[in-house]
Amino acid sequence: MRRREMAGCGHPLPFAAAAGLALGLALFAHQLLLTLAAVVIGPLPAVQTALYLSRKDLSENAVQAVSESAQETQAEPAQEAPALPAGGIEAYLVPLEGDEARPEGAGAILEKNYPQGSGEKYIPCGSGSIKNNTSVSNTDVAAEITNPLPFAVEWNSPDPQILIMHTHATEDYRLSAGLWYRPGDGSRTTDRDLNMCAVGRVMADTLNAAGLNTLHDETLNDYPSYTGSYANSRAVVQQYLSQYPSIKIVLDVHRDAIETENGSRMAPVCTVNGRQAAQVMIICGCDNSTTVSLPNYRLNLRFAAAWETAMEGLYPGFTRPVLFSYRFYNQDLTPGSLLIEIGGHGNNLNEALYAGQLAAQGLISALKQ
């Protein structure tokens, strides 16, 4: 699939051209270092991210030099490309396979809208709910989520406020329009236009367009080995936080995988503004004083409740109950660290892309409160 690219700057004038040539040579040399590093030490996610961040700084500094040179020659300033394509979600959607491509022995997809919970395990959260799988009392949880967010983002800031990343970046979705999937489909791909990176891209673009400076890391933390992916993603996040201490929110974007005993895959779905979307579910970890060390879990819980309230209030039926459980997921790194499941492996990619946009719009609403 063709990658989307930002609009270019037009033809540079002589001084800018010289600076541009210098940029090209510098980036070529840096890419050569990247290749040599990959040969010597292998595709370690933390190393990849360090090189990516270094290359990003080099590019930004060189682009600034080109810009300053162009200004000296009174070049016409290039128009800044919008963060979100003018076509909205349509600009991101991909062609899906029709039933003529359905293979023999295809597996079944079952669509279901998962409702908000009720009963002793569930705590109301605006129009949504929180499923409490911990020993923290419901009364305590209900009181905690009435507190304000533990951080304040800066709107239209030059400094990053949000980081989106993917511990299991290679998770993907079905590419069929019909309710079937291919036999042997492992629901994984390294193609960033088809896996979790594509969903994260929509979310980051939506947030940036609203004035929330958001970074999106596309490191494949679960490739080539699934084992150790959370250690890999932790190193990645720590590098970003070291380089950009302004970051308040870290979102680990995944998809779920719900399957019946006979192999049918579940697709959590809802309809928003006439278009089918995947349902989403926030997971917030809790400290248990032994195996899960999250002493500031209450801060993340407040954030989870605010986001859940905003999303379900805007789009009834869009969210599944927040899962509050003894999970770690590196949620000790910021007071705004959460994991969100965008649909499941039974959803098609377009449902997930749309859900990513809706989840980001819900986050914008929550942060404006």
Where are these predicted regions, by residue range?
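Active-site-adjacent substrate-binding region
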Residues: 296-323
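A short, glycine/acidic-enriched catalytic loop
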Residues: 182-186, 258-293
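N-terminal Lys/Arg-rich, disordered targeting/topogenic segments
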Residues: 1-11
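Solvent-exposed loop/turn segments at secondary-structure junctions
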Residues: 169-172, 220-224, 255-260, 287-290, ...
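Alpha-helical scaffolding within the catalytic cores
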Residues: 237, 262-270, 322-328
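Active-site-adjacent mobile loop/cap segments within catalytic or ligand-binding domains
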Residues: 319-369
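N-terminal catalytic or cofactor-binding beta/alpha core of small enzyme domains
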Residues: 17-248, 257-262, 357, 365-369
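Structural recognition of the beta-strand scaffold that forms the well-ordered cores
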Residues: 163-166, 214-216, 249-252, 281-284, ...
